[in-house]
Curated annotation (Swiss-Prot):
Disulfide bonds: none annotated. Was identified as a high-confidence drug target. This is Uncharacterized PPE family protein PPE24. It comes from Mycobacterium tuberculosis (strain ATCC 25618 / H37Rv). The gene is PPE24. GO terms for biological process: response to host immune response.
Length: 1053
């Protein structure tokens, strides 16, 4: 049994339905006891022999005894060690079983899943349960995967434990001094030879009494083995029918040394026992005596556990209906399995009695999902089948349709070969009877590919008499008028508040980017070029009117959360060198903007803008990173050529009257400053400074008037006192400053306060060179968080209005010339910025109330052509630019979450179509004329003849050879009209990749019976709902689903 293809119903049920770890624990205890006994025996044996040798027994015989006893003592000690190791491996196996029992899915969960699926499928009238069915199936697939994973781990662990066991070495077989004929182990043969009785030449002779037996000494039919008495036994020394094993007395037992019917195990006495050493019926476990016990070493009825005596509760399981059920979900009596209907079932999901397998409909079945009685194999429809997927009785082979077939995929009876269609065929792929060869069509063929079929079709001599057809009167008839009623399409409104669920955009990570060092070639020269003039043609926009009263329901835009953005620290590469370059002069031509006039009388209907609420915006506190370092750098000299500014005319400007408030300057006191004596300043001289004459052109100021200015209080300057100081040198220089003639003006009278300058000296003043070097460090600073409260903009109502015609005059801009600008070569310093992390920014949802768009009509609009004159650009040279390698760090954009939002409601008005009437159509009566067909003579002729050569079957189109008729598919079929591989029977089909099946009109793999759909199905008109690659485990009559047995399960009345 391959657990990887079994559904979780079987895998979980097998794990939970067995005897559990108790038998293995008992075995571990027994091995421990055996190890102790062997060690004690070895010590005792050694002690006895040592005592004998060291005591009164002396001499050569004593030495010989000691030498002969030593290997036995060593064997006993080694066997004790091996028994102890075996006990340890048994304990490890118990741990493995407990682990798999914990890992597999509980059977009740699997049953609940399947029940939910059936309920959803039966109520899925309009497909509304499709998502729920998909979810149930997905959960079931996960259960399947969990069970297969657990069983794989269990298989691996159990295999490792089993491989660690070492076989026990055999003790010495012979003792010294025995005669040769006795030491050889064949005393009877030796005595026979000594007596002179001759032996039969050629060895033993195997004689079978019956039909279609394979092996020797069998009495009955279709046995495969030795010394079986009965029918369809697969094994040796069985007495009964349908046994798979050895030395069984009874029928349909799977195992060895059983007495009874339908036992799955060994050494059982009774009916329907699952396990070993049970006496009674429907016991599950080891060493039970009674009925319906689950566990080990129980004596009684319906007991659950180990080593109990008595009668259990009416039902010791859960969900049972009946008496003495120790399993769960049973209906009946003495059921120790789960989900059974009947009496004494130790397997699961059976309907009937004393079934030790699973999913059977019938009695005494040791296999699984059979429909019938006493089946040892799987998916059989019939009785006493030791093979699998058979339709019929007494078949030791598999996928047969018929009876007493010991081969496979046969259609017929008593076939010992494979893929035969017929009776008593010993060879393979034969059509017919008693063929011992292969691929023959016919009877008693012994070769290969013999037997052909010839056909000829001949018509007899035939004369047809004349045929008189009288006239036929057809009465008048009229088709009534047909009126199609008017069709009313009611108003439709989309459901309100269609909600779009929240979704998240996943995070996006941009990998780091490596930009290698690059240097542009020096002195790239770009020749002068001109951009051609561009003319935009005139544009005609026709008149357009929007439909009136478009209604848009209120809707809300969901809140949008922008995740925090991490900008990693970045450092520009040091010493990026940019060579000197010159930008050529650029002349922008004058631009003519023609006069434009908007169309007159643009009408905008009245409309209302709904209230708009802007939610409050929280700008969290932000802190610039500390220690932003900008290294020192040097800007090259920059030459800015002269710029000619055209005359600018400023229109008259009028400044209104204004008042200056009173200005109060407080008294300022400078304390006395004392410079210590003894400071010496060396002499120095200033060179002559020549300033060229500065000419200020005539400035014309238009006539303007100033209003009277008044002071509220008298204005006087405060007293300023400067203490005396001295300058110990003479300062002489000359300057030529031309006379400056200020324009005329007048001031009102004011008074200066007393101004006194004391004697003072100016010391030598030295200003040392000062260089501002980098780095310049700007410390961190903190911006506190601030909140902007929500702003409510109330609804604005605008009545209809008409935009007047607006005319703008033509505008012409003069040419503007930018002379060339020269920049010397310079080096950009390295700049380092610390890592910056921006906090999350949340924009709350914005709600907009429903509103109606008015009807808007715009007249046709025509724009005049717009011409852009050519632009001339002189040639210039690009400098050489060198950039070092640049590597950008990865940039990660976190996921963006968008909450659900609601779509507005849209309404369409009702539509009614007018009725349609088709007028009546009338046809008048008429009579057909009589017709006479003269006699016809058809002479005898041969239409055709053909011959089918010998081969496997007739009219087969399968890829591989098949027997039978009209078979197709992969091949290896027998019977009639089968399509697939390994099929027998009539009109069966299995999908590509599946193998086997028998019966009539079945579709699926590994099935038998009549008109079944699905894989792993037997019986009549059953339907499995699992994929064809998975066994649905269905038997019985008219069942729909999986893990079903019985009648009409999973259907509606």
């Amino acid at each position: 049994m391959n657990f990887s293809v079994l559904p979780p119903e079987i895998n979980s049920a097998l794990i939970f339905a067995g005897a559990g770890p108790e038998p293995m624990a008992a075995a571990a205890t027994a091995w421990d006891g055996l190890a102790m006994e062997l060690a004690s025996a070895a010590a005792s044996f050694g002690s006895v022999t040592s005592g004998l040798v060291g005591g009164a027994w002396q001499g050569a015989s004593s030495s010989a005894m000691a030498a002969a006893a030593a290997p036995y003592a060593a064997w006993l000690a080694a066997a004790a060690v091996q028994a102890e190791q075996t006990a340890a491996q048994a304990a490890a196996m118990i741990a493995e079983f407990e682990a798999v029992k914990t890992a597999v899915v509980q059977p009740m969960l699997v049953a609940a899943n399947r029940a939910d699926l059936v309920s959803l499928v039966m109520s899925n009238l309009f497909g509304q349960n499709a998502p729920a069915i998909a979810a149930i199936e997905a959960t079931y697939e996960q259960m399947w995967a969990a069970d297969v994973s657990a069983m794989s781990a269990y298989h691996a662990g159990a295999s490792a434990i089993a491989s660690a066991l070492s076989p026990f070495s055999k003790p010495l077989q012979n003792l010294a001094g025995l005669p040769a004929w006795l030491a050889s182990g064949a005393p009877a043969a030796a005595m026979t030879a000594a007596a002179g009785i001759p032996a039969l030449a050629g060895g033993p002779t195997a004689i079978n009494l019956g039909i279609a037996n394979v092996g020797g000494g069998n009495v009955g039919n279709a046995n495969n083995g030795l010394a079986n008495i009965g029918n369809a036994n697969l094994g040796n020394y069985n007495f009964g029918s349908g046994n798979f094993g050895n030395s069984n007395i009874g029928s349909a037992s799977l195992g060895n040394n059983n007495i009874g019917f339908g036992n799955l195990g060994s050494n059982n006495v009774g009916v329907g026992n699952l396990g070993n050493l049970n006496t009674g019926f429907a016991n599950t476990g080891l060493g039970n005596f009674g009925f319906g016990n689950t566990g080990n070493n129980n004596i009684g009825i319906g007991l659950t556990g180990n080593n109990q005596i008595g009668i259990g509760g009416l039902n010791s399981g859960t969900g049972n209906f009946g008496l003495f059920n120790s399993g769960s979900g049973n209906v009946g009596f003495f059921n120790s399995g789960n989900g059974n209907f009947g009496i004494g079932n130790s397997g699961n999901f059976n309907t009937g009695g004393w079934n030790s397998g699973h999913g059977n409909t019938g009695f005494f079945n040791a296999g699984s999902f059979n429909t019938g009685m006493l089946d040892v194999g799987n998916a059989n429809t019939g009785s006493l089948n030791t093979g699998s997927y058979n339709m019929g009785d007494f078949n030791p082979g598999s996928s047969n349709t018929g009876t007493f077939n010991t081969g496979n995929a046969n259609t017929g009876f008593l076939n010992a070969g494979n893929i035969n269609t017929g009776v008593f065929n010993i060879g393979h792929m034969n059509n017919g009877l008693f063929n011992t060869g292969d691929m023959n069509n016919g009877v008693f063929y012994r070769g290969v590919g013999q037997g052909s079929l010839q056909f000829s079709i001949t018509t007899p001599d035939l004369t047809l008499p004349p045929l008189q057809i009288p006239g036929i009167s057809v009465p008048a008839f009229s088709l009534p008028a047909i009126t199609l009623p008017s069709l009313n399409i009611p108003a439709a409104t989309t459901p309100a508040n269609i909600t779009v669920g929240a979704f998240s955009l996943p995070g996006l990570t941009l990998p780091s980017l490596n930009i290698p060092a690059a240097t542009t070639p020096a002195n790239i020269t770009v020749g002068a070029f001109s951009l051609p003039g561009l003319t935009l043609p005139s544009l005609n926009i026709p008149a357009a009117t929007t439909p009136a009263n478009i209604t848009v329901g209120a809707f809300s835009l969901p809140g949008l959360t922008l995740p925090s953005l991490n900008i990693p620290a970045a450092t520009t590469p040091a010493n990026i060198t940019v060579g000197a370059f010159s930008l050529p002069g650029l002349t922008l031509p004058s631009l003519n903007i023609p006069a434009a006039t908007t169309p007159a009388n643009i009408t905008v209907g009245a409309f209302s803008l709904p209230g708009l609420t802007l939610p409050s915006l929280n700008i969290p506190a932000a802190t610039t990173p500390a220690n932003i370092t900008v290294s020192g750098f040097q800007l090259p000299p920059l030459s800015i050529p002269s710029v000619a500014i055209p005359p600018v005319t400023v229109p008259p400007i009028t400044v209104g009257a204004f008042n200056l408030p009173p200005l109060q300057i407080p008294e300022v006191t400078i304390p006395q400053l004392t410079i210590p004596a003894g400071i010496t300043i060396g002499g120095f001289s200033l060179p002559a400074i020549h300033t060229q004459p500065i000419t200020v052109g005539q400035i014309g100021v238009g006539q303007f008037g100033l209003p009277s200015i008044g002071w509220d209080v008298f204005l006087s300057t405060p007293r300023i006192t400067v203490p005396a100081f001295g300058i110990p040198f003479t300062l002489q220089f000359q300057t030529n400053v031309p006379a400056l003639q200020p324009p005329g003006g007048g001031l009102s009278t004011f008074t200066n306060g007393a101004l006194i300058f004391g004697e003072f000296d100016l010391p030598q003043l030295v200003v040392h060179p000062y260089t501002l070097t980098g780095p310049i460090v700007i410390g961190s600073f903190f911006l506190p968080a601030f909140n902007i409260p929500g702003i409510d903009v109330p609804a604005i109502n605008v009545d209809g209005f008409t935009l007047p015609q607006i005319t703008t005059p033509a505008i012409t801009t003069p040419e503007f010339a930018i002379p060339p600008i020269g920049v010397g070569g310079f080096t950009l310093p390295q700049i380092t910025t610390q890592e910056i992390i921006t906090p999350e920014l949340t924009i709350n949802s914005i709600g907009v109330g429903g509103f109606t768009l008015p009807q808007i009509t715009t007249p046709p609009i025509t724009t005049p052509p717009l011409t852009i004159d050519p632009i001339n650009l002189t040639g210039f040279t690009l400098p050489q630019i060198t950039t070092p390698p640049i590597t950008t760090p990865p940039l990660t954009i976190d996921p963006i979450n968008l909450t659900g939002f609601t779509l507005p409601q849209i309404t369409t008005p009702p539509i009614t179509t007018p009725p349609l009437t088709i007028e009546p159509i009338g046809v008048g009566g008429f009579t057909t004329p009589p017709l006479t067909v003269p006699g016809i003579h058809l002479p005898s002729t041969t239409i055709g003849a053909f011959a089918i050569p010998g081969g496997p079957g007739y009219f087969n189109s399968s890829t591989a050879p098949s027997s039978g008729f009209f078979n197709s598919g992969a091949g290896g079929n027998s019977g009639f009209g089968n399509n697939g591989s390994g099929l027998s029977g009539w009109f069966n089909t299995n999908p590509a990749g599946l193998l086997g099946g028998s019966g009539y009109q079945n579709f699926g793999g590994l099935s038998s019976g009549f008109s079944n759909l699905g894989s792993g199905v037997s019986g009549f008109a059953n339907r499995g709902i699992l994929p064809f690659s998975v066994a649905s485990v269905v038997s019985g009559f008219a069942n729909i689903g999986t893990n079903l047995a019985g009648f009409f399960q999973g259907t509606t009345s």
